[in-house]
């Protein structure tokens, strides 16, 4: 049974997709397929700096990987949390280790494996130090990026709000 109504595709996005697919001359069968009620929005911009991505969910698409290449660098310079096909922009464990370090500083007991991982990020343990001073085995650029994201109000305990992908790689994805 073919699907009659989308639960993901907003009307503006479907309209644009239909304008593109209507140019395909192959033997396509016409289908009745209704978008979800939400309108959605398509922003076609040629400069990332013209877009305020500090709020909301974003899906940044480009046709090829070479076109995507400068985007993560820009997002990092703006202190924005994002994900690519390679994962999120800070890696899996650094934010967790900061949380564990804060617990260790308060005298809370944490699992031994996590404690060892935290201690590997520093030369010597000093509970008086904030994570960004204590973690001297973490690159300064990474610490600056993390502090910038936190200052921007990014919630690093959740999935990133911004996804960066090729059009092909995003098939089925949504912002």
Predicted ranges, named:
Residues 1-175:
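The feature marks helicase ATPase cores and/or their adjacent C-terminal helical subdomains
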